[in-house]
Amino acid sequence: MGLEEQGRAREDTPLLGKGRPLSSKFKTFANVFIAIVGAGVLGLPYAFKRTGWLMGLLTLFSVAALINHCMMLLVHIRRKLGVSNIGSFGDLGFAACGNLGRFVVDILIILSQAGFCVGYLIFIGNTLANLSKPTKSTTLMSLRHLMGVSPKSLYIWGCFPFQLGLNSIKTLTHLAPLSIFADVVDLGAMAVVIVEDIKITVVQRPQVVAFGGMSVFFYGMGVAVYAFEGVGMVLPLESETKDKDKFGKVLALSMLFIAVMYGSFGVLGYMAFGDDTMDIITANLGAGVVSSLVQLGLCINLFFTFPLMMNPVFEIVERRFWSGMYCVWLRWLLVLAVTLVALLVPNFADFLSLVGSSVCCALGFVLPSLFHLMVFKDEMEWKQRALDVGILLLGVILGVSGTWSSLTEIFQE
């Protein structure tokens, strides 16, 4: 196997690359954190505003428990099959139900990864447009009136040529360390927002609600599922763990820690701003220097995370349509498609809910429970069978209802 082939990414390739030594418990914990925590957390306060803080918390912790359970289902399936070359979700789909299984997983991974990148562009466009609101006539305003486009669209199109260049890189080894930067900036932004939330809450106590009603339940589920999406990384992470018998415990503790962090962030953000909570919480921080630096930092980290998240899409599309060979024009077409979708979607949090309700529900709930049913069908007790069927049906119901709810919200904008 040549060096170039070894450097090619697959849908199971961790963003930080695969290290030679196996991972300790702490490193596994950190890898789970990096694989899951992303920009979705910034939409949680707005989701709590829609669902109510108590319903939001219940939804968040329920989704965390379900995602953790379904991740472990994938691990149990691989151990049961005992096939050494099952390294990714797609490989497991093929082992469980042949080419159809791999095809379905591939399609959903393409949609989910591309959906994340659409969300990144929406965030960048909306944030930069918010930061650069002119107080008088400027070149930006002149361009807007001349071209008939919004500032958000101008910023997204401004990213486009640079993304073409970044996504033309065959191997992302040199960009991979930026995923560490992305998580550091995310944590920094969360810390700044939490501090500001506490300071604002002490001064003013806006009215908040505990339950927003069942009409927004599926909306909240979609945002929560998006925020915890990372099921495709569980197999490579488990493969790299030194003490595999303790992997389930480490994963559960990681998910609990992330859920507590997410819940605190969402509740404090909503408690601070109440009905004025915006779809991207950093926009509530005002126009100060610290706020601007945090928002610019988030834009930069998402800008460089974009090609990392698109890499699994390129791998799948090139494997299926270009014999696995590098194809720059195919990559450019995919980047163009993602850009065009980002231009059409107005609201960051609404889009999180759409992707979470549709694609992430299928990847996180439906497929793991379905594959588990198929592989363990001859030795399952009725309780386990009922649990798998229940999760499968829940995933389908949440997917259909949440997708409809999110599309309704988007088209009402």
UniProtKB/Swiss-Prot annotation:
GO terms for molecular function: neutral L-amino acid transmembrane transporter activity. Keywords: Amino-acid transport, Membrane, Transmembrane, Transmembrane helix, Transport, Vacuole. The keyword Aminoacyl-tRNA synthetase does not apply. Residues 1-27, 76-103, 167-174, 229-249, 310-331, 377-390 are cytoplasmic. This is Amino acid transporter AVT3B. Residues 49-54, 125-145, 196-207, 271-288, 353-355, 412-413 are vacuolar. It is a multi-pass membrane protein. It is found in: Vacuole membrane. One of its GO terms (biological process) is neutral amino acid transport. Ubiquitous. Belongs to the amino acid/polyamine transporter 2 family. Amino acid/auxin permease (AAAP) (TC 2.A.18.8) subfamily. The chain crosses the membrane at residues 28-48, 55-75, 104-124, 146-166, 175-195, 208-228, 250-270, 289-309, 332-352, 356-376, 391-411. The keyword Iron does not apply. Translocates preferentially neutral amino acids from the vacuole to the cytoplasm. GO terms for cellular component: vacuolar membrane.
